[in-house]
Amino acid sequence: MDARKFSTHILDTSVGKAAANVRVTVSLLDEIQEWRSLRAAQTDADGRCLLLEPGQFPSGIYKLTFHVGAYFAERDVKTLYPAIDIIVDCSENQHYHIPLLLNPFGYSTYRGT
């Protein structure tokens, strides 16, 4: 049984809260080294988002584009980063959870559980 899933969670560290309603685009690097967009999703009220479910998530190199400019604009906050790309190698047969810790002038990410 394929248990692979791909998910994210965004926390806005400038206010100490989850970042809700942020659009996230998932792309896969194809065999000719070009990005192929797979889908767009949106974080829920808790800042969480299931990006790809089992059966939709083959091994490969993925790019997550977090469209955070609109999130900050809605709050009348200037940001240096209108979008953030995170590229991950998802070659193991396991769940991948990639959180984003966000503020208007910086960000950090890590391999979550």
Region locations from a protein language model:
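Beta-strand-rich domain onsets/edges
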Residues: 1-20, 28
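Feature of secretome-associated and extracellular-like proteins
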Residues: 63-113
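Beta-strand signatures of extracellular beta-sandwich domains
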Residues: 23-27, 63-65
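Short, acidic Ser/Thr/Gly-rich low-complexity loop/linker segments typical of extracellular
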Residues: 33-50
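A glycine-anchored, Pro-Gly-centered beta-turn/N-cap motif
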Residues: 57-62
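Short hydrophobic alpha-helix segments
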Residues: 14, 22, 39-42, 53
